[in-house]
Amino acid sequence: MERAEKNKMTKYEVLKKYFGYDSFREGQEMLVDALLSGQDVLGIMPTGAGKSLCYQIPALLLPGITLVVSPLISLMKDQVSTLNQAGVHAAFLNSSLSAAQYRKALGFAMEGRYKIIYVAPERLLTPEFLYAVQSMEISMISVDEAHCISQWGQDFRPSYLKITEFVDQLPTRPVIGAFTATATKEVRDDIEALLSLRDPVRLVTGFDRKNLKFTVQQPKDKFAAAESFLAEHEADCGIIYCLTRKNVEEVCEKLEQKGYSVTRYHAGLSDLERKENQEDFIYDRKQIMVATNAFGMGIDKSNVRYVIHYNMPKNMESYYQEAGRAGRDGLPAEYILLYAGQDVITNQFFIENMAQESEDPETTALIRQREEKRLKKMTFYCFTHECLRDYILRYFGEYGSNYCGNCSNCLSEFETVDVTVAAKAILGCVRECRQRYGTTVILDTLHGANTAKIRQYHMDENSHYGELSKEPVYRLRQILNELQVREYLYVTADTYSIVRLLPKASELLDEDGTMLMKMAKEEKRIPKAAKEKTKTKTSAAAKDLSNEEAAVFEKLRALRMELAKEHKVPPYIIFSDKTLIQMAMEKPSNKEEMLAVSGVGESKFEKYGEPFLACLAER
């Protein structure tokens, strides 16, 4: 596209021609207009809300070049591939290029051949890059994953702090846009200050992603729980996050033995193997990615239908960001967290052994305290009987509804139960043994277990021994968890976790206090809706289609895979599942009708339109 042609086009024409959309989503147009008028912006928008378009459209309408600062090579490659497929001249500059490739790309940039250049923050202050930008007309800088600039953020990158130094060395200051999906108020304030944004237009569209269903389970056998879900979603792709490399290897190996299409990703693999495994997942050659949190930031794969956390993450920010990798196309997606008490201990170990964040010991201690508070909030999320979505939104400073109708708590049946007797027994048992043992010993004592450990510790002589023998152990564990949430007790996160009393415990032990709590009516705490699912070879994305439409959708998916292999691009870059579903429902029969489908722009139609029309014409 020639510069003159771009500048004659309106934002709506650019939106339709290059991206295939007829209208902007919530908040997009406001940020586009601000950047076009020369105002800095700060956009906090949930994953899948279309942050990229907020700077890509101004980039095509403004003169000169837009630089996009991006933290990950995979994200840059993904975005550039998507833009090139849409007919936009874009490139990336990072360490994946050889010296010759880098110089060639930089030369093309100086000649004005690109409208959008993605660059790693580490490259900004290199002499070669600084020299090159002096002769470029840089009209805008967009900072992607802007939370990386904040030490309050979950992915702090010191290299992001160099962005303002780079801007100061440009001949003229360009307009600056900062974008992220997950940022508390502290992080937002940091972004504004550390990027020196000038009276920015701020947009926080909200953190709620209504297409995500949230589920928390506390299964006895995590692998069995995960496999049960996977068996019901054979046609879908998803991510399983584990806390440790060992977990990744174990889960991946077990799934391979069961015949699943699975690969893995963690920092212990070679660069080449990580790259190959990531591409296998992105190109749909493998359906399941088992990974540590080293995988995912910047992955733009739109057709991920589920994320399973095999272990509880360290904080709500990480949890919600990783959940955001499912359902980016706006179609229904599921997010499942499998909790066990060991997860808290593992995370606490990571906090205690985290790298020195500051030369000042006091600052390091404060950072660790902050991380421990975040871990506590994350743990309480796993225990709550309230709406999970509302818990998440309140954590990020928003207020939702007490009932979302799309989380495991809202879909389960609860009753309010007086648990005073059990709560007092738990607290009394802990006090009588002088707060020396962990949850398993305490619960086994109350249940009257006759084990070697109970006898060794003389817990069979505790006055509360066997007092709650008729209560299911899982219910006792629920009550103990609730006592933590209400701060009657806490469980240390040492190698051998110990149950300790807090001052508030005396309110129940020594006074006439009562304790009521919500408890699931059924012993199985998995929602009924989840139990009624059956095996299907059709993607969950197509669940609302008729049988005929679902069959057409699967044919379109097969064609997309063929074209992806032929053009060597990820399938979702050709067309998203959402676009294919609209095709299956509306069955366009000519170019005009095909261009009316959301996500089909002129450039995409020229490349792929005819094969899809031919597929739709088959009966």
Say what each PLM segment does.
Residues 2-11, 359-361, 370-372, 388-390, ...:
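Accessory DNA-binding and partner-docking regions appended to nucleic-acid-acting proteins
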Residues 2-18, 22, 26, 30-52, ...:
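Helicase motor core with emphasis on the C-terminal RecA-like subdomain
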Residues 34, 309, 381, 582-583:
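Short alpha-helical segment immediately N-terminal to, or the first helix within
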Residues 97, 179-183, 218, 269, ...:
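Catalytic cores of large soluble enzymes that bind and process phosphate-bearing ligands
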Residues 366-396:
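Short, charged low-complexity linear segments at domain edges
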